[in-house]
Swiss-Prot record:
Highest rank taxon of the organism: Bacteria
Protein source organism: Yersinia pestis
Membrane topology: Peripheral membrane protein
Keyword match Chaperone: yes
Name of the molecule in the record: Chaperone protein SycN
UniProtKB keywords: Cell inner membrane, Cell membrane, Chaperone, Cytoplasm, Membrane, Plasmid
Taxonomic classification: Bacteria, Pseudomonadati, Pseudomonadota, Gammaproteobacteria, Enterobacterales
Entry keyword annotation includes Disulfide bond: no
One GO CC term on file: plasma membrane
GO biological process: protein secretion
Subcellular location field: Cytoplasm; Cell inner membrane
Quaternary state and interactors: Interacts with YscB to form a complex which specifically binds to YopN.
Described purpose of this protein according to its UniProt entry: Functions as a specific chaperone for YopN. It could facilitate the secretion and the subsequent translocation of YopN.
Amino acid sequence: MSWIEPIISHFCQDLGVPTSSPLSPLIQLEMAQSGTLQLEQHGATLTLWLARSLAWHRCEDAMVKALTLTAAQKSGALPLRAGWLGESQLVLFVSLDERSLTLPLLHQAFEQLLRLQQEVLAP
């Protein structure tokens, strides 16, 4: 069991999702309002991915906004990034060093991803 498993497990429980031990290196949570949240452990990094499918007519504006906001470092203290999956899936993500991972940092990263998503999708 990795030392960060209790942190990830507590985070999932805070979101109302029970976990079992041992945790998978890839956890996928379906969020009712914001799409799919994935937590992926790889090496000494934990990456949070927030993916959401968009209607085709919103894709271009969302892509430009997401890339502009993340490139301009307007996304807050954490290095948020944006990408695109397939034809219509906006992906916002942040990678965290496991050595500095805490429960408050995990919540902060998720909240910043949610705020960025809301800003990108705002009219």
